[in-house]
Amino acid sequence: MNPSRNLFLIGPTGAGKTSVGRRLAAHYGLAFVDLDHEIERRTGTDVATVFAVEGEVGFRRRESTLLAELSAGDGVLLVTGAGAVLAADNRALLATRGYVLWLQAGIEQQLERLAHDHQRPLLAGTDRRTRLEAMATIREPLYSETADLALPATHGIATTCSQAIALIDRHWQRHSLPTPSPAA
């Protein structure tokens, strides 16, 4: 059990991490950060362009640096990109700096949710099913290794959020954030 002040969401692309994460952050009073969106904000361009210019290695380097920075504090709900778990250092940071919920999604569900999304660089120009299956084979053991809890995200966002809250409340030994001292 990881007593923590942070909550991290991991899982495959199309699992609903960002949508669920926003609601969970509001529920628990945590600052919401989406790692991919933060990379876009800081670079001034989208993830696909970062991949095109810097390659996956450059993107993963940025991702790791930003994860280390943003997970260092307290009171954050951070949504990782689907591939953040590929780096052992990232997995270690997640495991030691927060409570980790793995939102699980099957291939059919991912294909349905990503049908109109053409901004995913690792899914561009390939047979999406084959690519998603290959990524799942590599990443699912890493998600399992890193996660404190796993939740199949097989329903809509509202239902998944309700299920996540019930699951988290049963298992997360959350440390309270420090209360400010009264002014003297």
Where are these regions (language model features)?
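Hydrophobic anchor at the beta1->P-loop junction of P-loop NTPases
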Residues: 9
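P-loop (Walker A) phosphate-binding loop of NTP-binding proteins
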Residues: 12
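Conserved lysine of the Walker
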Residues: 17
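Hydrophobic positions on the alpha1 helix immediately C-terminal to the Walker A/P-loop
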Residues: 20
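ATP-dependent small-molecule kinase phosphotransfer cores
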Residues: 34-95, 119-120, 133, 142
